[in-house]
Amino acid sequence: MATLKEVQLKIGSVKKTRQITSAMKMVATSRLRGSQEKMDRFKPYASKFSEVLGSIAGKAGEEASPLLVPREEPKKVNVILCTSDRGLCGGFNVNLIDKADKFIKSKLQDKEVTFTCFGKKGRDWAKKMSMTIDDQYLGVVGGKFDFSVASTSGQKLINRFLEADVDEVYLVYSEFKNLARQEPVVKQLLPIPSLEAMEKPDEAGAKEETAYLAEHICEPSSDALLGEMLPKNIFIQIYDALLQTSTSENAQRMKAMENATKACKDMIDELQTIFNKTRQAGITADLMDIVGGAEALN
C-alpha cells in the first residue's frame, strides 16, 4: 500500500493537471466562439454567391470554362487535406486522416496522388506514408487566417489543372454540424461538378431568389461571367472548409479538455478515498499498539 506522502504527492500532481486541462478548455471555448462567429458571418456571403452562380449556370453552356471539363483518363490527383497543427483534440485528426486514407485506397488506387496539406498532422502522416506533398500551409487550421490563404492555394491548383499538371482535385475536411457532431467529408473541387448541380438550391427560400435572379440579363454574356466566377467559387469552398475544420477542431478540443478535467476530478476523489483509508489504517494500527502496550504493563 502506498504511504500517505506518496498519495498526497499524487493528489497534488493530478490537481495541477486539472488546472492545466481546465485552462485549456477555457482557451478552446474562447477560440470556438471566435471561429464559429467567423464561420456564421461568412455563410450568408457564400450562400448568396452560390445562388447567383446557380442562376448564371442555368444560362451558360458546359463549355463556358475549362474548369468544368473532365479529363478522359484522369491519372494525376491532388488531395487537399485539412488537419490541425496540434493534438489534444480527441479523434479529430485521426478521423480526417482515416477518411483520406480510405478514400485514396478505394477511389484513387491506380492514380498518382499528391497532397496539399493544411496542418502538421496531415503533413506528418503524408510524409510517414511516403506521399508526395506539393504544398503545405501550417498554422492555419485553429489559428488566424484570412481569405488570401484560400485564394493563393486555390489559384495554384487551378493553374496546375489548366496546365494539365493535375487532373482532379479533392478536398478532405471536417464538416461542422453542431457542437456535438462534426464529420470528415470528401468533396470534389476540380473539375467542377456539372452545371445542373449548381442550379439546385439548398433551401426552399433560395428557390424563389434563384428564379428572380434568372430574369436578369448578363453582360457581356453568361459564359463570360461564369468563367470569372468559377475560380472564385473554388476559393470560397476552400475557405469555407478551413473555417469549418477550425471550428470542428476547437469544438473537439474543448470536449476533450472537459473530459480530461472530469477524469482528473474522478481520480482525485479516488486518491482522496485511498488517502483517508490509509490514514485510518495508520491510526487504527497506532491505537492497537497503544492498547497492546497498556495491557502488557498491566
UniProtKB/Swiss-Prot annotation:
UniProt topology in membrane: Peripheral membrane protein
Gene Ontology biological process: proton motive force-driven plasma membrane ATP synthesis
Record CDD domains: F1-ATPase_gamma
GO terms under cellular component: plasma membrane; proton-transporting ATP synthase complex
Coiled-coil annotated spans: none
Pfam families: ATP-synt
Localization per record: Cell inner membrane
GO molecular function annotation: ATP binding; proton-transporting ATP synthase activity, rotational mechanism
Domain of life, source organism: Bacteria
Sorted UniProt keywords: ATP synthesis, Cell inner membrane, Cell membrane, CF(1), Hydrogen ion transport, Ion transport, Membrane, Transport
Primary subcellular site in the record, as a coarse category: membrane
InterPro entries linked: ATP_synth_F1_ATPase_gsu, ATP_synth_F1_gsu
Family label: Belongs to the ATPase gamma chain family.
Complex and partners: F-type ATPases have 2 components, CF(1) - the catalytic core - and CF(0) - the membrane proton channel. CF(1) has five subunits: alpha(3), beta(3), gamma(1), delta(1), epsilon(1). CF(0) has three main subunits: a, b and c.
Function as written in the Swiss-Prot or TrEMBL entry: Produces ATP from ADP in the presence of a proton gradient across the membrane. The gamma chain is believed to be important in regulating ATPase activity and the flow of protons through the CF(0) complex.
Protein name: ATP synthase gamma chain
Organism ancestry: Bacteria, Pseudomonadati, Thermodesulfobacteriota, Desulfobacteria, Desulfobacterales
